[in-house]
Design a protein with these regions (language model features):
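...with weaker cross-activation on analogous glycine-rich loops/strands in unrelated enzymes
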Residues: 224-283
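Surface-exposed patches in mature extracellular/periplasmic domains of secreted proteins
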Residues: 38-47, 211-223, 241-247, 253
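Cysteine-nucleophile protease catalytic domains, especially the papain-like/related folds used
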Residues: 150-239
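Residues that flank catalytic or metal-binding motifs in active/ligand-binding sites
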Residues: 51-53, 200, 249, 261, ...
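Active-site or metal-binding loop neighborhoods of secreted/extracellular toxin and effector enzymes
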Residues: 102-147, 271-330
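Sequence contexts marking disulfide-bonded cysteines in secreted/extracellular proteins
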Residues: 176-178, 199-201, 205, 228-230, ...
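Function-determining sites in protein domains
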Residues: 1-157
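Residue-level detector of buried hydrophobic side-chain packing
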Residues: 27-28, 204, 265
Length: 330
């Protein structure tokens, strides 16, 4: 029995549905005809943008279905979990798989809005900083490193700076706290045994909880119910996040795909470069945005969560703080 997951959300549970035996047989024929169209479900080697990241197919039960029989056959190379749609030339199968969610009885929760987003295909980010281990690198001060000291012209809104003022959002201001806790630990969250089990809120809270759909407020007994700035902020408050500096404090940013999903960024280094990191759902944590820009500043110019490429996460909800020793999620 095969389950399909539309990998599209960062925080909320992704839509899932089951394939019929006839659909399993067609998928089997497609994969056997062109096995290179599938890729590992989760790997640190692919840097995904926010939004649509393909479809994950997994065998949830061994039965008499076409796929189970083929996989149990001797010398069968078929995996029990894989991703479709993340490679060039695989969109036909991905499009067909998405169409299998349209039967009402499957109750897949795939809306017209999600179908429209998925129709745009997967955006793999060519990341200049994706492989950088900031925890052990010498580029924390980008101003002293030529490779990380150049920015293309930033049009529109400039990057926020600590205490810079002029920030309009429902949440808090980015304060220049004197007791920050910084941890550029994307590699820790990208451990193959944990990468798929932690979402953006786990990374923001610096808590590798292995809770794939950790939700603001659940730990505090008041899980966010509306996917709006106000709704998710209420959940943050229940989990102990504050509007002002905290001892040994984490600094995070909340952004919203209106009424659909939430996403977080975490400040991972101090000034003058102010690097930010984030983790799109169950895919790798990284220090770049959807356009491949590294999330840091040089002499006050560059990219931060407020002005980086965020796809459909258009609502900027502000800055929040918590003591790192108490920032647990559920």
């Amino acid at each position: 029995m095969l389950e399909v997951e539309l990998d599209i959300f960062s925080g909320m549970p992704n839509p899932k549905w089951l394939l019929s035996d006839r659909e399993e047989k067609e998928l089997l024929d497609r994969v056997i005809a062109e096995p290179t169209q599938i890729s590992p479900a989760y790997t640190p080697d692919e840097q995904f943008s926010l939004g649509y990241r393909g479809l994950i197919v997994r065998e949830i039960k061994t039965d008499e279905s076409s796929w189970s029989k083929a996989r149990l056959a001797s010398a069968s190379p078929l995996p029990n979990e894989f991703r479709v749609g993340s490679k060039p030339g695989t969109q036909a199968t991905a499009t067909w798989l998405l169409q299998t969610s349209e039967m009402k009885y499957k109750q897949s929760r795939v809306t017209d809005e999600l179908r429209e987003v998925a129709a745009g295909g997967v955006a793999l980010v060519q990341s200049s900083g994706g492989a950088v281990d900031l925890a052990n690198s010498t580029i924390l001060d980008a101003a002293d490193n030529v490779e990380y000291s150049y920015f293309p012209t930033v049009t529109g809104e400039g990057a926020h700076t600590p205490g810079g003022g002029g920030i309009v959002a429902e949440g808090a201001t980015w304060f220049p706290c004197g007791a920050n806790y910084f941890d550029a630990n994307a590699n820790f969250f990208n451990d193959p045994a944990h990468i798929a089990k932690n979402n953006c809120y786990c990374f923001a809270s610096n808590h590798r909880a292995d809770s794939r759909y950790a939700r603001p407020g659940r730990r505090g007994g008041q899980p966010a119910t509306s996917i709006t700035c106000a709704g998710v902020i209420a959940g943050l408050y229940a989990d102990g996040w504050k509007d002002g500096c905290q001892p040994n404090g984490l600094t995070i940013v909340l952004v919203i795909w209106p009424n659909v999903d939430y996403h977080f960024y975490r400040l991972v280094t101090g000034g003058p470069s102010w690097w930010w990191g984030h983790k799109p759902g169950g895919t790798p944590a990284k220090y770049t945005d959807d356009c491949g820009h590294s999330l840091y500043q040089v002499n006050g110019s560059g990219y931060a969560p407020n002005n980086c490429c965020r796809g459909n996460y258009t609502n900027f909800c502000g800055y929040f703080y918590q003591n790192n020793s108490t920032a647990f999620v559920a």
